[in-house]
Amino acid sequence: HPLVPDDFLIRAIGDPQRRDELAFLDLAGLRSRDVLKRYGATDLLYSLGTAHPGAVTLHNHPRFMQQLRRDDGMVVDLAAIDILRSRERGVPRYNEFRRLLRLPEARSFEDLTHNSQAAAELAAVYDSIEDVDLTVGLHAEPPPPGFGFGDTAFRIFILMASRRLKSDRFFTSDFTPKTYTPEGIRWIAENDMSSVLVRHYPDLGPALHTVHNAFAPWPVLPDPATEH
């Protein structure tokens, strides 16, 4: 997934000079416990909180997912497998998907990407704009200003996100003091992700005291040695 980086920068909240770089496979699976013991939860949370996700765009699929070595030694390309699975399941191609949403289809590769190099690369792979796979088309779409991904994916995201919330009784009909207790409702009203993190990991306080949304990248704390 383009959001997942290949490499991670591990920071120390109490030592701005310490910066270690780890590849995804260095901290994935069974290796994760050793990484947690080595750096501790506070520094790992700080490192992940200050990191930025990858852009949802072409040429940004993680390298390790394209050359993933399984436990049996077989190397697989998950990017190619995703395309193959979509085709096997009958997922509509990009233009047909747009039409099913009552949206105008792309008339050409240039119309899809607004990028001449990307359009040429797509033309080298696909015989027609109608052949472009949905995932490829979604990654090729230029996002509107201020958006993290293109118009087509955003429309589906809005539908799915709102449906998940509206279909969960604990967010709707049972979001009441009777279900959560008055004390529970007070905790919900007076806390957010930042306060939850700081309550369990107090050393994160300096990194989060100005953060209004802990799910967005946090600011990196300045190095006192370089401040004047």
Predicted features along the sequence, with ranges:
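Terminal regions of secretory-pathway proteins
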Residues: 1-228
